[in-house]
């Protein structure tokens, strides 16, 4: 109660009791004001939203800032690594110099890839992507060179990153056109006014009068000067060509062609090309950028040997300038060198249809072409794909290896010498082809010498092949290789060779001092005119005379074997052969001195045929239409078995001689390289045909001495004995 009374008393007893409500009102108003202020403060969070809109925090928004911040650190790390590996002079050698990275040297390498006066009939297209990759430079550096070359019409644009190389064929026409445009725009007068103004500025600091400023302020805009036939009417190029580097390059060349002393400084060129009215608006940094672009143009023109750098001494000091060094226009030398280009428009029409198609599609004037909507969609899709491909970063990847600089130098040298090496390779290929053709075309002639006919790895085996009209005996002369000589440990063979009876010579084989061989040959042909062969008509070589036989005998060797093989006739023979002298008592004598005869007897059984390359028949003079056939396979089989050229291990084979006692290699068809028709010679009234057969160079000598037996000398058909049936089967048919 006391507290309540106190409150009531205090409330009622206060002299200012009537004023307390207003005080409460004022306090409430202050509270409301604070609340309103607090509510007003609630709007402040909207400001960070505005900052976010200004600088959005996206992954790619500050990519440039991150790269610029990280690139110095990356470069410093690379330098530290190089400094650790190299020190002093070695570090300077590894780092590329400014000269290696200069635009002038790059332009020299670019020009070395292409001829100065190309053939317009050849497709001389240039792909900038390939050139940038081969020269290992950025693509923008190639663009700078190509833009300057395009201003001089040394190249023309075919498509995106595709150009056609014209070389110096159009330089004289380009200089004529540029000089005319420069005279129309009064560039010579402007150069003189600027030079006078510089002199006046040196004398006094006063500004030049208005009369001298008018020509510079009101200079007309000069577009890109195009030659007839080399225009490119693409709208995308024409929209920005006034600001391109190639237009500035043309104007820079105009200043040299028009000025009286053909020396122009970069400051004067920049003032004329940019214009003094624009120089006031441009900053110093932009003006310096323009001068740098002029430096790039001057470097390319210097590499083309059109200008050279000089220094001009003035009152202010020494200034760099450039002097025109190109010879006079339209000289006779240039016309003579460019004379192969008289058919340039026709050749261009044939070699570059894409360029003409592009010109027709973007033709200017009243006549225009429209595309079908489907083609427009297709063209847009192709352009989008090309943009995606070309938008990829073209800067080269820097490798951490120390040999990258050496590799780049070698690549640049290879790019410079590529054309010369390609020409030398083409010449060497042609020479190799010619030599290979000559080696293949060396065919062995029938009547040639033995050196040309016989290769180094094998020798010839001469064979005497009789005309098989009446199945006379075959005679085989087997010649060993040149390297083979009869060993001294085989006296029986030598002795048996000496025991050859001289009273039974082989008819048709001429010996030294034998004068009756020719007459016997003639008489044998007269006695048997009907037995001359008919198949000799198709032979590729003619019958050799007795003198030709001498040539053959000179090439043979004294360690051969003479193998007479008699084949029984298929049909019954006339009685003339039986009434003749007994041939069984005679031994065959080799036409070569030192060659011993060898008689064979067939055993009944089949005989394996040997594939032999034989020539066709040849017509023999003196015959009455009769024909000869190629040697029988059986004869070659037994002859080569005796020579140990093929194996005789077949069942019921032929037993040749006692010396054939060991295994022998089989003669393959590839080892018989040549069968040569030498000469037909008669023997006992029966004509023989001599063949030359190539033999392997493996030396084969008789293995031992065997006693002479009766069966060894027995000739089939001799001493009144009938020939075996197996011998009759050998001469059944001819081998074509």
Swiss-Prot record:
Family note: Belongs to the E2F/DP family.
Main location: nucleus
Positions of the DNA-binding region: 98-167, 240-326
Cross-referenced SMART domains: E2F_TDP
Region (Disordered): 1-26, 386-405, 435-456, 483-551, 716-736
GO BP term (any one): hepatocyte differentiation
Amino acid composition bias (Basic and acidic residues), ranges on this chain: 509-539, 726-736
Quaternary structure note: Homodimer and heterodimer: mainly forms homodimers and, to a lesser extent, heterodimers with e2f7.
Composition skew (Low complexity), residue ranges: 393-405
Record comment regarding domains: In contrast to classical members of the E2F transcription factor, atypical members contain 2 DNA-binding domains and regulate transcription in a DP-independent manner. Both DNA-binding domains are required for DNA-binding and are proposed to form an intramolecular structure that is similar to the winged helix structure of the E2F-DP heterodimer.
Ranges of compositional bias, category Polar residues: 15-26
Signal peptide: none
Example GO molecular function: DNA-binding transcription factor activity
Gene: e2f8
GO cellular component: nucleus; transcription regulator complex
Listed InterPro entries: E2F (IPR015633), E2F_WHTH_DNA-bd_dom (IPR003316), WH-like_DNA-bd_sf (IPR036388), WH_DNA-bd_sf (IPR036390)
Keywords: Activator, Cell cycle, DNA-binding, Nucleus, Repressor, Transcription, Transcription regulation
Localization: Nucleus
Pfam families: E2F_TDP
Function: Atypical E2F transcription factor that participates in various processes such as angiogenesis and polyploidization of specialized cells. Mainly acts as a transcription repressor that binds DNA independently of DP proteins and specifically recognizes the E2 recognition site 5'-TTTC[CG]CGC-3'. Directly represses transcription of classical E2F transcription factors such as e2f1. Acts as a regulator of S-phase by recognizing and binding the E2-related site 5'-TTCCCGCC-3' and mediating repression of G1/S-regulated genes.
Protein name as annotated: Transcription factor E2F8
Annotated source species: Xenopus tropicalis
């Amino acid at each position: 109660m006391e507290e309540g009374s106190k409150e009531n008393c205090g409330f009622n007893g206060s002299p200012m009791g009537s004023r307390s409500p207003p005080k409460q009102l004022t306090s409430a108003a202050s509270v409301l004001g604070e609340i309103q202020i607090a509510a007003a403060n609630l709007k402040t969070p909207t400001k960070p939203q505005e900052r976010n809109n200004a600088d959005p925090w996206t992954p790619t928004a500050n990519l440039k800032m991150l790269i610029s911040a990280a690139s110095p650190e990356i470069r410093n790390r690379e330098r530290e690594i190089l400094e650790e590996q190299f020190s002093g002079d070695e570090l300077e050698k590894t780092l590329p110099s400014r000269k290696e990275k200069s635009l002038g040297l790059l332009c020299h390498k670019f020009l070395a890839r292409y001829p100065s006066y190309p053939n317009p009939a050849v497709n001389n297209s240039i792909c900038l992507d390939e050139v940038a990759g081969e020269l290992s430079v950025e693509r923008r550096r190639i663009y700078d060179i190509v833009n300057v070359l395009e201003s001089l019409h040394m190249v023309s644009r075919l498509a995106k990153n595709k150009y056609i190389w014209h070389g110096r064929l159009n330089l004289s026409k380009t200089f004529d056109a540029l000089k005319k445009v420069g005279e129309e725009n009064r560039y010579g007068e402007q150069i003189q006014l600027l030079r006078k103004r510089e002199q006046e500025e040196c004398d006094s600091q006063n500004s030049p009068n208005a009369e001298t400023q008018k020509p510079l302020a009101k200079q007309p805009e000069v577009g890109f000067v195009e030659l007839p036939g080399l225009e490119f009417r693409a709208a995308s190029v024409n929209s920005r060509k006034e600001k391109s580097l190639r237009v500035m390059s043309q104007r820079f060349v105009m200043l040299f062609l028009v000025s009286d002393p053909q020396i122009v400084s970069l400051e004067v060129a920049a003032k004329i090309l940019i214009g003094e009215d624009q120089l006031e608006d441009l900053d110093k940094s932009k003006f310096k950028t323009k001068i740098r672009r002029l430096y790039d143009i001057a470097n390319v023109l210097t590499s083309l040997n059109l200008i050279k750098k000089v220094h001009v001494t003035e009152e202010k000091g020494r200034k760099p300038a450039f002097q025109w060094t190109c010879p006079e226009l339209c000289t006779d030398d240039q016309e003579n060198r460019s004379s192969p280009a008289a058919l340039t428009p026709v050749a261009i029409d044939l070699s570059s249809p894409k360029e003409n198609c592009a010109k027709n599609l973007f033709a200017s004037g009243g006549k225009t072409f429209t595309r079908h909507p489907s083609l427009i969609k297709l063209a847009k899709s192709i352009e989008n794909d090309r943009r995606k491909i070309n938008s990829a970063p073209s800067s080269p990847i820097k490798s951490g290896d120390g040999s990258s600089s050496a590799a780049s130098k070698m690549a640049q040298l290879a790019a410079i010498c590529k054309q010369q090496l390609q020409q030398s390779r083409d010449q060497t290929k042609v020479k190799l082809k010619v030599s290979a053709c000559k080696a293949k075309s060396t065919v062995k002639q029938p009547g040639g010498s033995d050196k040309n006919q016989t290769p180094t790895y094998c020798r010839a085996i001469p064979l005497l092949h009789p005309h098989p009209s009446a199945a006379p005996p075959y005679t085989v002369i087997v010649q060993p290789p040149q390297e083979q000589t009869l060993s001294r440990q085989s006296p029986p063979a030598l002795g048996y060779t000496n025991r050859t009876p001289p009273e039974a010579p082989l008819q048709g084989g001429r010996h030294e001092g034998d004068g009756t061989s020719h007459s016997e040959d003639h008489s044998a042909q007269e006695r048997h005119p009907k037995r001359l062969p008919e198949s000799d008509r198709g032979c590729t070589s003619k019958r050799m005379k007795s003198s030709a036989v001498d040539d053959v005998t000179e090439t043979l060797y004294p360690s051969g074997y003479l193998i007479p093989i008699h084949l029984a006739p298929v049909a019954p023979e006339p009685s003339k052969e039986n009434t003749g002298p007994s041939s069984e008592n005679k031994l065959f004598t080799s036409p070569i001195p030192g060659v011993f005869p060898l008689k064979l007897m067939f055993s009944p059984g089949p005989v394996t045929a040997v594939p032999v390359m034989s020539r066709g028949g040849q017509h023999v003079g003196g015959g009455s239409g009769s024909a000869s056939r190629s040697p029988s396979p059986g004869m070659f089989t037994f002859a080569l078995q005796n020579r140990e050229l093929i194996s005789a291990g077949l069942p019921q084979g032929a037993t040749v001689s006692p010396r054939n006692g060991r295994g022998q290699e089989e003669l393959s068809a590839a080892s018989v390289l040549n069968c040569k028709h030498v000469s037909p010679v008669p023997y006992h009234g029966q004509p023989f045909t001599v063949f030359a057969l190539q033999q392997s160079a493996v030396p084969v000598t008789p293995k031992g001495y065997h006693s002479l037996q009766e069966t060894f000398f027995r000739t089939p058909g001799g001493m009144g004995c009938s020939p075996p049936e197996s011998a009759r089967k050998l001469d059944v048919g001819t081998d074509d």
